[in-house]
């Protein structure tokens, strides 16, 4: 009986020590911060941002970055020099469901958009369940309200994340073929 108490005390001490050293998910440097609330931004008229013969809504992000919302497929993304993107990716894109992904592609993925204009600060462009907004610093955030997932393209960092309760690890681009 005494031996069982000693074993239980030892196991409890080990578990207690492990829990005491646990770090909350929000403090983990490998966990992306949440996507900003783009829905609090003022909406713009999507017709003013129609590109690619009406197939997309497009706008300019940070210098050299083109962002689109595809009205045919429900996809959304930004292409160009993505500051701080994992693996040097030059494309981040998502679809109607699921977490957006980073990739390295040849050329400018959304070249068919042609000339695009920037969104004014603190506005958003929405198509169905996806909204993309720009803040005062020129940071682009796109959020799919259906899955609560999206991405951020900012002046120093770009990442994909989930706003659901579980933490989202930073997304690495797929390996080059």
Model-inferred region functions:
Residues 46-72, 120-136:
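Short, low-complexity cationic-aromatic patches
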Residues 28-49, 74-120, 155-177:
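A low-complexity, Ser/Thr/Gly/Pro-enriched, surface-exposed linker/loop concept
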Residues 13-14, 25:
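Cleavable N-terminal signal peptides
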Residues 57-60, 76-78, 142:
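Generic recognition of long tandem-repeat/solenoid scaffolds
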Residues 64-66, 84-89, 147-153:
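Short, surface-exposed beta-strand/loop "edge" segments at domain boundaries and coil↔beta transitions
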Residues 3-7, 19-36:
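C-terminal region of N-terminal signal peptides and the immediate post-cleavage residues
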Residues 116-164:
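Extracytosolic low-complexity repeat regions of secreted or lipid-anchored proteins
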């Amino acid at each position: 009986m005494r031996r069982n108490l000693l074993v239980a005390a030892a196991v409890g001490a080990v578990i207690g020590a492990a829990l005491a050293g646990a770090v909350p998910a929000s403090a983990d440097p490998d966990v992306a911060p949440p996507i900003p609330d783009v829905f609090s931004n003022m909406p713009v008229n999507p017709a003013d941002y129609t590109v690619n013969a009406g197939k997309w809504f497009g706008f300019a992000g940070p210098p050299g970055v083109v962002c689109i919302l595809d009205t045919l497929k429900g996809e959304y993304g930004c292409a160009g020099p993505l500051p701080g993107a994992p693996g040097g990716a030059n494309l981040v894109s998502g679809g109607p469901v699921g977490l957006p992904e980073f990739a390295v592609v040849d050329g400018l993925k959304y070249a068919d958009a042609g000339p695009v204009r920037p969104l004014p600060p603190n506005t958003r462009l929405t198509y169905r369940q996806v909204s993309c907004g720009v803040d005062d610093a020129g940071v682009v955030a796109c959020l799919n309200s259906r899955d609560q997932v999206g991405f951020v393209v900012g002046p120093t960092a770009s990442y994909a994340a989930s706003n659901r309760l579980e933490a989202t690890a930073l997304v690495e681009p797929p390996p080059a073929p």
